[in-house]
């Protein structure tokens, strides 16, 4: 019951803070203009990620104070401080457009500090026959993972409602998993872990509430965008939560309905499948055409759906539905498939996604041409 209170608190904080924040952005002309690859028209306030962060932080701190977590260590406070730094990098980028190089350096630096406080993958838990990995390799893989996930999330923030709904899907699944699977697991075997189930439940429910509040103002026609401020902060938080869940899941000894999870690490990645799969698809597409994988174009999934006549709200709901269905299927498959077969399943799902998307959009384009 208490989790509902904290979720409602973050929702109300976002809902109440957003209107004055929008007016502040409009007053100081901190607006996102249309043109280029952008689908929206006119000028729209951005940096909505600031309100999402503040609202979720208020909820988390409220939870810590009310529930009096004696086992909440300095790591949680260090984590909040580092997430504040990520937010500031995003604000700076929204206001002055940081160069990709500077932005990457900032991401790596924050990633390193997060690894230092224990937010990293410590073991492969039997994947490829590997268990505990060297610290230096753990740092490299974890930082790379944070950079990839945060940038993949940033790349899907192209239409009203899509980035918010994708993050909402992940945090809902995360909350359910921590609540029903990891609730009584507050210690892990690795020494420098970040094992505090109650803290991560607070993070998940706070983000669910603040994202719902944000979507009220970000739904088509959007009154505000989350901006790089939001996409960088939320993208990093998604990566962090995935790394934490990998450690919890790797050491999980519980069964659900007498069934044991056989693929511990890879199932976590599938909760964020669509952004990662679409980013890989677009990068390969660009390379095949002799372009840099980082060059800008209009080939992301939301661009394709927009091309066949879908409105922002329909695109957001369609991509959300795809992600939810894939998450449910992937969780079910984790009870059936060992790691090696789960890898084959992931590769197969990517091909189904790529060729299914291509066939669907081409079919709709042909129908539109016939009508004309």
Per-segment meaning from a language model:
Residues 94, 124-133, 310:
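Membrane interface segments of multi-pass transport proteins and intramembrane proteases
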Residues 69-70, 91-98, 128, 154-160, ...:
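Membrane-interface helix caps and helix-loop-helix hairpins in membrane proteins
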Residues 132-142, 198-202, 263:
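Membrane-interfacial loop-to-helix junctions in multi-pass transporters
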Residues 45-65, 112-117:
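A generic, lipid-embedded transmembrane alpha helix
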Residues 96, 148-170, 231-232:
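Short acidic, Gly/Ser-rich segments with clustered Asp/Glu that frequently serve as metal-coordination loops
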Residues 33-46:
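Juxtamembrane helix-capping/reentrant segments at transmembrane boundaries
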